[in-house]
Amino acid sequence: MAKNIQAIRGMNDYLPGETAIWQRIEGTLKNVLGSYGYSEIRLPIVEQTPLFKRAIGEVTDVVEKEMYTFEDRNGDSLTLRPEGTAGCVRAGIEHGLLYNQEQRLWYIGPMFRHERPQKGRYRQFHQLGAEVFGLQGPDIDAELIMLTARWWRALGISEHVSLELNSIGSLEARANYRDALVAFLEQHQETLDEDCKRRMYTNPLRVLDSKNPDVQALLNDAPVLGDYLDDDSREHFAGLCKLLDAAGIAYTVNQRLVRGLDYYNRTVFEWVTNSLGSQGTVCAGGRYDGLVEQLGGRATPAVGFAMGLERLVLLVQAVNPEFIASPVVDIYLVAAGAQTQSAAMTLAERLRDEMPGVKLMTNHGGGNFKKQFARADKWGARIALVLGESEVADGTVVVKDLRSGEQTAVAQDSVAAHLRTLLG
């Protein structure tokens, strides 16, 4: 007997019951993006490896440990995308979208990182990102954060996420801070774990978000990044905080917040939650004014964020399950025998024309009334339409509310209006 082939570890199938939840959440996210005037861009899953090395940084965990990289038949090094910003910038440069233009873009799709699979974190994961090009003021940073806050309200999870902000300044300011931080860490190497000792010289800012409690305690006495900020970055960050205060968006300034990718400057932010066990990041982003030029384009200010959809789905399921309690179908059409099947299918098509968006399923495969009503219940239908020979003859259909059990015969010509009333 042949051995079953299974999905690769950390790469999951999403079955019909799960995809219905995803579609509901994704639809909400896309509607909010549209209300802010953002446009979708669709990008390749595979890119040339140098794109990510140049954008993300050679000495980041993503590039050193986590990328799925391979050579194609021409000997070119290709990589399954580990994040979306680099590909979005590459596309903007390649197609002339960024030259003296303002762009507000979003994308959605699978990303790939070779990490240890755990709840909410997989080797193939799904990400929604938004990127804005051509605007350099703190007002657009604030708008992106306001947009995400509107998502949380729409999903009913506002009370379960909190915003952390920081400014990591300019490249020059970070270089000065990096020197001070390394000098401090060198004096306390006995407290550092092996990972922090390695990062101390390759990417010292990553030591700031070490999960080691001893290292975190040590960092209480470390130099603070905010003390090294340039004047422009201070002014930018103060402007952002003022706008968020005016919008009523609560936040915490976290001086240890740095992002895991090298291209960020000035604003960085994360929305975090404690509702999934240990604290986890739901959405994160920041400003990356140098990346377009770094990848071969003209100097272009830019800011964006990305959100892992697996973790968002888990959060909505945990704290607002009513949001996703949506039936697979609204209406189930029961037909009494093969002789009425044609009339049932004709009626179903007419109702789909008259009621766009309604989820209507027609019974197929026969079965008596008991079996058909059991199928209606299985699919979560609120209403059953019953069509027998007598109803076909006199142009009516029986409408049964499956919650209350009430039923009434309605003329087929007016059944759509009757159903709209029942469905609200």
From Swiss-Prot:
SUPFAM superfamilies reported in the protein's UniProt record: Class II aaRS ABD-related, Class II aaRS and biotin synthetases
Organism superkingdom: Bacteria
Record keywords, A-Z: Aminoacyl-tRNA synthetase, ATP-binding, Cytoplasm, Ligase, Nucleotide-binding, Protein biosynthesis
InterPro entries the UniProt entry points to: aa-tRNA-synth_II (IPR006195), aa-tRNA-synth_II/BPL/LPL (IPR045864), Anticodon-bd (IPR004154), Anticodon-bd_dom_sf (IPR036621), His-tRNA-ligase (IPR015807), HisRS-like_core (IPR041715), HisRS/HisZ (IPR004516), HisRS_anticodon (IPR033656)
Subcellular locations according to the entry: Cytoplasm
GO molecular function: ATP binding; histidine-tRNA ligase activity
GO CC terms: cytoplasm
Record's protein name: Histidine--tRNA ligase
Gene3D superfamilies: Anticodon-binding domain, Bira Bifunctional Protein, Domain 2
UniProt source species: Salmonella typhi
EC number of the protein: 6.1.1.21
Subunit organization: Homodimer.
A Pfam family it matches: HGTP_anticodon
BP-aspect Gene Ontology terms: histidyl-tRNA aminoacylation
Family affiliation: Belongs to the class-II aminoacyl-tRNA synthetase family.
Reaction catalysed by this enzyme: tRNA(His) + L-histidine + ATP = L-histidyl-tRNA(His) + AMP + diphosphate + H(+)
Record flagged with keyword Ligase: yes
Record's keyword annotation contains Membrane: no
